[in-house]
Amino acid sequence: MAEVVAVDVGATWVRMAIVRGGVIEAIKRERNPGTEEGLERVLQGLAEGLGIDRGRVEKVGAASIGPLDLRRGYIVGSPNIKSHIVRLSTILKRLFPKSKVAIANDAVAAAWGEYLLGRLAGTPDLGYITMSTGVGGGFVVGGRLLLGSRGNAHEVGHIVVDMGWEGGRCGCGGTGHWEAIAGGRWIPRTSSVLARGWRGPETSLYRAALEGRVGSAREVFEAAAVGDDFALHVIDYIARASAAGIASVKAAYDVDAVIIGGSVYLNNRRMLRPLIERHLAAYAPFSSRIEVVDASFGDNEGVMGAYAIAYRNPEDLPIF
């Protein structure tokens, strides 16, 4: 079976892998420099590091942060990188001149990967949610991958989950968005906002949040893991916002299952999943109960999604 080069362009990491028959044979990663020129250098370096004969690759799949201009294969206006436009299709065609290149939003590609290869493979109606630097989603309905007119039918991180949110704007400019509360880059800010109304014990994390000294989502989860009451309050709020988002997804797409991945969720799923499921019971009526499942491929969810869109092109997905 022919090999596929699978590329995962995330906000923090860029991964490239050689995948054959659904099995990753080799993989490398580098930090995303956040610029178009820097990304091209990183991709070239990854290809060289993997020993890929770039002139002989038949298929390339790329799972990318968005928003996308899917018809051109460009990243346009992403709040998570510096360059306003990244001509990803152009970069990949330069690097792999004889290849057929497929590009999709990372969460959309992951949904297709789960549908073709994951533990719920063949389930005709499923959703995939990534909780990582940001929050995104992808959906298969009736066995078809939903794309939207520009490839952005899946930007569920910008669902409003708190109309009274006073924590500042999302990276896109909106307020009260799921991503602005539960996205990894915003969790430190979420802790600071919640600290202003906290009436419980003055814990270490509470004092750090009140003074704006929480530097990462990891600090919040680590404090919660050792029983910091305020940290547990923050995690519960993040889970509640996420449950509201998932309930909205259920109402909009009528999927039978939602698969959750992304580093924020996967690294903390033992803490987050039971809280999300508990809050879902309040936000979704009994008749709309939804199965919540952990992602099948861990950190390689984007890579396997990239492989899937190249291996079996979804209907209406442009090929470059």
From Swiss-Prot:
Its EC number is 2.7.1.2. It is an enzyme of class 2 (transferase). InterPro entries: ATPase_NBD, ROK. Keywords: ATP-binding, Carbohydrate metabolism, Glucose metabolism, Kinase, Magnesium, Nucleotide-binding, Transferase. It comes from the Archaea. Gene3D superfamilies: 3.30.420.40. Its cofactor is a divalent metal cation. GO terms for molecular function: ATP binding; glucokinase activity; N-acylmannosamine kinase activity; UDP-N-acetylglucosamine 2-epimerase activity. Activity increases exponentially up to 100 degrees Celsius, the highest temperature tested. GO terms for biological process: glucose metabolic process. It holds the Pfam family ROK. It catalyses: D-glucose + ATP = D-glucose 6-phosphate + ADP + H(+). Mg(2+) is the most effective ion. It can be partially replaced with Co(2+), Mn(2+), Ni(2+), Cu(2+) or Ca(2+). Optimum pH is 6.2. Disulfide bonds: none annotated. Monomer. This is Glucokinase.
